[in-house]
Amino acid sequence: MKPATPKAELLPSNQLPKAVFRGPLLLGKSFLGVLTICAVVMLSSWIATLAEAAPEEKPAANAQSAAEYKLTIPFGLEESKVVIPEDNPLSREKVELGRQLFFDKRLSKDNTIACASCHLAKFAFTDGKRVATGIRGQKGGRSAPVNFNRVFSSAQFWDGRAATLEDQSVGPFINPIEHGFANHDEMIAKMMKIAGYRKLFKEVFGEEDIKIGNVGKAIASFQRTILSGNSPADRFDQGGEAGAISEEAQHGLLLFREKARCTKCHSGFNFTDEKFHNAGIGWDTNTVDLGRYMLSKNPEDIGAFKTPTLREIARSAPYMHDGRFKTLEEVVNFYNQGGIKNPHMDPLVIPLELTDQEKHDLVQFLHTLNGEGWQQATAPKAFPK
């Protein structure tokens, strides 16, 4: 079978042991109550080094001090796992600037696509489509990934090609299918014509000249405030709320950890091992996306994609990196049969032999993973002029 080269990415009870989420297989150490991170920063002390997509930039000496920003971590998530770069600390002004940029369709070649176009709150910050759609209705080769809880994540995108959230934040602008700019300079030239943006960048970064690295910092800061936690499943296991989930879902949770082997990949409090796996997607139709291999050139990575979080999974259909499954039932059936055999199959993916009732209960558990912490990520009332 000849693998296909992917298109650009726009480019989804009483028998239970006590605290079944705890331990190395799933949520690990947890905290009671809501945790708060307070970051008070001086922007004038920055020396930021971004990767290829976001080159080195130094704020002007007269950059203002940033106002305190309080990142509230919902119950069930882990404060110690928060990743905020030293060269891009959170501030209220920067987060609000990032919000403007995230929702502004003018940051596309034809003024039709914003970051939020593919990351809609009602679809758990995906777009509800099999593959994402960019300018002029062009279709990408992959499903839009969720962008909440990115404050806990390392490599970004399905294939992990962006090492940081700052890099991820500016990559789509120069994707010909997504935002459509030929290069970052073209986009910056367009932004520089908007006096309101020059003013905001002056206030946040100390200079009117807009730099792509600072665009990435602002958008990444906003994305780090989009969270999902305090789900019924969290409250059942960690909060001791016995009635938070149904008995079917409780049985599904036990299956999740044991017979269904879900925690082999969907582990930890964010339900992801942050690694890359090949489950055989595409090998049945000769449409294999080479995935991680395109970056690593390691044959073991052929067809491997990053494990997505399962939080909000009931709202993020369709599923898999190519959006092939419309329902969670289809996903469970796929893994129950052991994926799709191929020469580079991850050995963790094996037939599960779940009964119909067990598959039903597992899906019921997955429906308990919707939470809160993202509801404040709304569009601004107005955009800079």
Give the label of every model feature segment.
Residues L26-L27:
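Juxtamembrane cytosolic/matrix-side boundary and N-terminal portion
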